[in-house]
Design a protein with these regions (language model features):
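Short glycine/proline-enriched turns and hinge-like loops at secondary-structure junctions
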Residues: 68-69, 138-141, 165-170, 207-208
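A short, Trp-centered hydrophobic/proline-enriched beta-strand micro-motif
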Residues: 122-131
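Hydrophobic, small-residue-rich alpha-helical packing segments that form membrane-like cores
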Residues: 135-139, 154
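A short core secondary-structure module
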Residues: 144, 157-197
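Alpha-helical interface subdomain recognition
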Residues: 1-87, 93, 106-111, 118-123, ...
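A short, charged helix-loop
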Residues: 212-237
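Flexible, small-/acidic-enriched active-site or ligand-binding loops
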Residues: 142, 190-220
Length: 386
């Protein structure tokens, strides 16, 4: 594996970095003061990203994307991730990014016209409704939502929650248990029988649409709503989630990097006990630990991306990266808050926002504990070498 960046990738990285520094970061303050303006700000940022040729870095050229390799995407999304608005400005943020990949791989042409193409343009947002109050999520075998056949269609019944982006989403990919087995359905937000019960109050606030609770009650859909083949819902979920876990890591790496940069800048100008913070060995150790962990996290992401580019499965590598990156970035942000002291817990810097937003990363797309259990089982029972 060659760790150097070719000229094309390096130039693209620099363009994304300039876009984030010059255009995206200056808009953060507006959103921080009024989260209700986020969608308006994002529309303006997406327009500029399109003008700069940075939109849809994760999609193939025939769909209007940049046609990047996974390794190139890792570089781009890390740079975009230096602002919480960055990935959304490129239309490459969760859950839409993962849903785009799934629809591109599995949807038929009619479904692509109705759902994928508007999603690609940034006209609409989407949701992925898998997690349930009774446990389906980390353990998908607990799936309770049902899809009962009626005539030439299905009747969906059940409850979903923590569906990210639910408020304002145009449609949802819903996982329910049919006679053939777990099956995915495409359901419009305003479809009869689908009700957004509430937006769940959570500690993170920078995801447009929040995290919703959805009730499916007598929700009748036709066969055309089935995504892919009936009974393959769990397979499609893994098809979506393995790369999505990795792109989450790519984006959050950028947050860890920026938090550490802010801590370094502060340590170089702030004085205590007759010298700058940067001269205190304890602060030096904290900065060093963040550099060590973020560097290791980046290499894990790049390795998994390299395997994807070779056409290999990355279930094991994606789990390891998800655990390590989520925890490493969380620690880096925590150290940055500690180094900057009172300023770090204020909203005069984005650090307190980063702190709130990064903590859930250890939970969604599989809690660290579930991934550790899976990693351990594969290592023990498949004879994997460290």
């Amino acid at each position: 594996m060659d760790f150097s960046l070719d000229q094309e990738t390096a130039a693209l990285r620099d363009r994304v970095r300039a876009f984030v520094e010059e255009v995206v970061i200056p808009r953060e303050g507006e959103v921080a003061k009024d989260l209700g303006r986020m969608e308006e700000v994002l529309r303006e940022l997406q327009k500029e990203a399109k003008a700069r040729g940075l939109f849809l870095p994760h999609m193939p050229k025939e769909l209007g994307g940049l046609g990047l390799s996974w390794r190139q995407l890792a570089v781009v999304l890390e740079e975009a991730g230096r602002s919480l608005l960055g990935p959304r400005a490129l239309n490459a943020a969760a859950p839409d990014e993962g849903n785009m990949h799934l629809l591109h791989r599995v949807a038929n042409e009619a479904q692509k016209r109705r759902y994928l193409y508007p999603l690609l343009s940034g006209e609409v947002r989407s949701g992925f409704a898998m997690t349930e109050p009774m446990g389906a999520g980390a353990d998908p075998n607990l799936l309770k939502a049902t899809a009962r056949r009626r005539g030439r269609g299905f009747v969906l019944e059940g409850r979903k929650w923590f569906t990210t982006g639910a408020e304002g989403a145009a449609f949802f990919i819903v996982l329910a248990r049919a006679e053939e087995g777990p099956t995915m359905f495409l359901v419009d937000r305003d479809h009869p029988g689908l009700k957004l019960v509430r937006t769940i109050p959570t500690m993170d606030h920078w995801s447009p649409g929040g995290h919703g609770e959805i009730l499916l009650e007598g929700c009748e859909v036709g066969e055309e709503a089935v995504l892919g083949e009936p009974g393959k819902g769990f397979y499609y979920a893994e098809l979506r989630l393995d790369p999505a876990r990795l792109t989450h890591c790519m984006r959050w790496l950028g947050v860890g990097v920026r938090a550490t940069e802010l801590a370094q800048e502060y340590a170089l100008r702030r004085e205590s006990f007759g010298k700058r913070l940067a001269e205190h060995q304890g602060v030096q150790f904290m900065i060093a630990d963040s550099h060590i962990e973020l560097h290791a996290a980046r290499l894990m992401v790049w390795h998994a991306a390299w395997k994807l580019d070779r056409g290999e499965r990355i279930r094991h590598e994606a789990s390891m990266a998800k655990v390590f990156v989520a925890e490493a970035v969380g620690r880096a942000v925590d150290r940055a808050v500690q180094i900057t002291g009172g300023l770090g817990i204020s909203e005069d810097t984005p650090l307190s926002i980063f702190y709130r937003e990064v903590r859930p990363f250890r939970i969604y797309d599989g809690p660290s504990e579930v991934h550790r259990a899976s990693i351990g089982k594969r290592a023990l029972y498949k004879g994997l070498r460290p």
